[in-house]
């Protein structure tokens, strides 16, 4: 599993740059264009929020747990558009500080270990782009991946009433995934071996499920699947829009980029993180169908 230090590396490092690029409560997960790429990124993210809130029957007063909440974009939506109540959990201190400053009820807590005694139970639960971080390469190599996901679904199960719904979206490996031994940061630029090696650098402590089937199977028998759709093409467009926003000039942001230069020369891992901004390995992985992306709605039975 990714630990707090890993998630601080991935998210807290870019906290201010992210907020200056995407807004204080920007989404850092695939939007929902449904193939209509004339939509703006903001419209497509809002369409995603609406889809999730509708799928989970979130209305006025619903109590919602947003696991792996990032900078709280979904929390912002359900508070303002549905008058719902929400608690958000993240493992990035920078995200939690920013969310609290913006008035959201967000804390640093590992969502995989939440118990009903902590906050009570919920009407609905979301985990948007969190599962990717729950199983490490080492756990996968030790054959523990399914156990990790089953334990997670057990946690969610205990927090919902029968009939309560859970939404998750997650990247998965897809039909062109290569062998782990082939991953190599020195491989040909643009190759699956190279971009997958960068992915592992960008998301330390993280490994993906092998297709949605693995996730759906691990959710049984406590959950039935209500709906499933691939967001792979939508994610490619999302990343293309993120790249423009990260590059858009803003004096403070460019100053922050400059302030990171010394670290670039002294920290090899950080140098790989910078390469990610140039290459967008996840976009290449989606294009090559090394990876896919799924939106899954579950109901507790
Ligand atoms: C890709 S971001 C998605 C953020 C947000 N859901 C969104 O859509 O913008 C992944 C998030 O997962 C969080 N995360 C990963 N593992 C976690 C864990 N075990 N407990 C709580 N949060 C976790 C990270 O801190 C980060 O906020």
Predicted regions and their residues:
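A short acidic, Gly/Pro-enriched loop at the edge of an enzyme's catalytic core
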Residues: 114-125
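Substrate-binding/catalytic lobe of Class I Rossmann-like enzymes that use SAM or dcSAM, i.e.
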Residues: 172-290, 301
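Conserved class I S-adenosyl-L-methionine
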Residues: 61-68
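A short glycine-rich, Lys/Arg-flanked "PGG" loop and its adjoining helix->strand segment in the class I
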Residues: 145-162
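Conserved SAM-binding strand-loop segment of SAM-dependent methyltransferases
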Residues: 103-113
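Conserved Class I S-adenosyl-L-methionine-dependent methyltransferase catalytic core
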Residues: 1-55
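Conserved beta-strand signature within the Rossmann-like core of class I S-adenosyl-L-methionine
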Residues: 163-170
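Conserved SAM-binding loop of SAM-dependent methyltransferases across substrates and taxa
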Residues: 71-82
């Amino acid at each position: 599993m990714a630990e707090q230090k890993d998630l601080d590396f991935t998210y807290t490092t870019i906290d201010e740059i992210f907020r200056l690029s995407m807004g204080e409560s920007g989404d850092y997960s695939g939007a929902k264009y449904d193939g209509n790429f004339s939509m703006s990124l903001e419209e497509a993210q809002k369409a995603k929020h609406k889809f999730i809130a509708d799928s989970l029957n979130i209305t006025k007063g619903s109590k919602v747990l947003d696991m792996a909440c990032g900078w709280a974009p979904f929390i912002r939506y359900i508070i303002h558009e549905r008058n719902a109540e929400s608690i958000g959990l993240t493992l990035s201190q920078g995200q939690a500080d920013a969310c609290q400053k913006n008035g959201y009820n967000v804390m640093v807590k590992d969502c995989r270990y939440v118990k009903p005694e902590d906050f009570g139970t919920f009407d609905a639960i979301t985990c948007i782009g969190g599962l990717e971080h729950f199983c490490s390469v080492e756990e996968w190599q030790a054959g523990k991946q399914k156990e990790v996901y089953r334990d997670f679904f057990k946690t969610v199960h205990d927090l919902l009433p029968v009939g309560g719904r859970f939404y998750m979206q997650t990247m998965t490996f897809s039909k062109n995934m290569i062998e782990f031994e082939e991953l190599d940061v020195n491989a040909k630029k643009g190759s699956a071996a190279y971009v997958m090696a960068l992915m592992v650098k960008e998301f330390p402590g993280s490994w993906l499920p092998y297709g949605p089937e693995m996730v759906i199977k691990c959710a049984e028998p406590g959950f039935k699947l209500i709906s499933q759709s691939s967001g792979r093409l939508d994610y490619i467009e999302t990343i293309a829009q993120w790249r423009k926003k990260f590059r858009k000039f803003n004096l403070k942001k460019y100053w922050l980029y400059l302030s990171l230069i010394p670290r670039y020369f002294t920290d090899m891992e950080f140098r790989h993180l910078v390469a990610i901004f140039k290459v967008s390995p996840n976009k290449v992985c989606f294009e090559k169908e090394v990876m896919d992306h799924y939106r899954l709605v579950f109901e507790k039975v």
